[in-house]
């Protein structure tokens, strides 16, 4: 696959072609996913749950994120690598910069930070210093204790209004991409149309500029046995993992995934 850059992703949004993203934590799956055509590999702090067996992402450290980023880099075949800043790794803008530098040196092309408009100062500082940022809004797993669990965000009109305003504010602060998780499909569509940067969705309907799933979920692997509504098992009917990865890419590109059954209403 030709090397994917931010320019590539902006071009895909401009021409209306969907962007494909999957989580990835090691060299073998990095090679498999990138060779299947997945454009963005997300080294997610979800590794705390799917690899380490924790019940949340909170125990994951920056050092662990750097380790897995370096592993993904070694297997990657042209995809853009996006790495999460883990819990409390961006408590201050300067701390965010120091930890982002660690992740970029390990092989990340961009970092992802969970939050809302209060992130503007941090995003501005990172962007000014050459660190591209993806802002993660909606259901933010690092604040699951404040949110009261893994619940859809933005169903109330006041909350939806605030999310729209926050998305615009973060773009103006320098965010290069947005990720919306567990947001009503209509709201996700409005935010996607309101900003000029790529918007990736998970449980946010089909109108976003692209889709992401946790690798283990889309391969039918689950420690807990609980499968989120927005997940589809792409291993079903496929002879091997490569075919499942290709099927995911094709489904996103053809907008046959996600279907209405994978999204949420207001």
Swiss-Prot record:
Top EC class of this enzyme: transferase
Recorded metabolic or biological pathway in which this protein acts: Cofactor biosynthesis; (R)-pantothenate biosynthesis; (R)-pantoate from 3-methyl-2-oxobutanoate: step 1/2
GO cellular component, one term: cytoplasm
Entry binding sites for Mg(2+): 45, 84, 114
InterPro entries in the cross-refs: Pantoate_hydroxy_MeTrfase, Pyrv/PenolPyrv_kinase-like_dom, Pyrv_kinase-like_dom_sf
The protein's Enzyme Commission number: 2.1.2.11
Gene3D superfamilies associated with the record: Phosphoenolpyruvate-binding domains
Alphabetized GO MF terms: 3-methyl-2-oxobutanoate hydroxymethyltransferase activity; magnesium ion binding
Keywords: Cytoplasm, Magnesium, Metal-binding, Pantothenate biosynthesis, Transferase
Listed cofactors: Mg(2+)
Cofactor binding notes: Binds 1 Mg(2+) ion per subunit.
Subunit structure: Homodecamer; pentamer of dimers.
Family in the record: Belongs to the PanB family.
NCBIfam families: panB, PRK00311.1
Role: Catalyzes the reversible reaction in which hydroxymethyl group from 5,10-methylenetetrahydrofolate is transferred onto alpha-ketoisovalerate to form ketopantoate.
Record-given protein name: 3-methyl-2-oxobutanoate hydroxymethyltransferase
Provenance organism: Pseudomonas putida (strain ATCC 47054 / DSM 6125 / CFBP 8728 / NCIMB 11950 / KT2440)
Lineage start: Bacteria, Pseudomonadati, Pseudomonadota, Gammaproteobacteria, Pseudomonadales
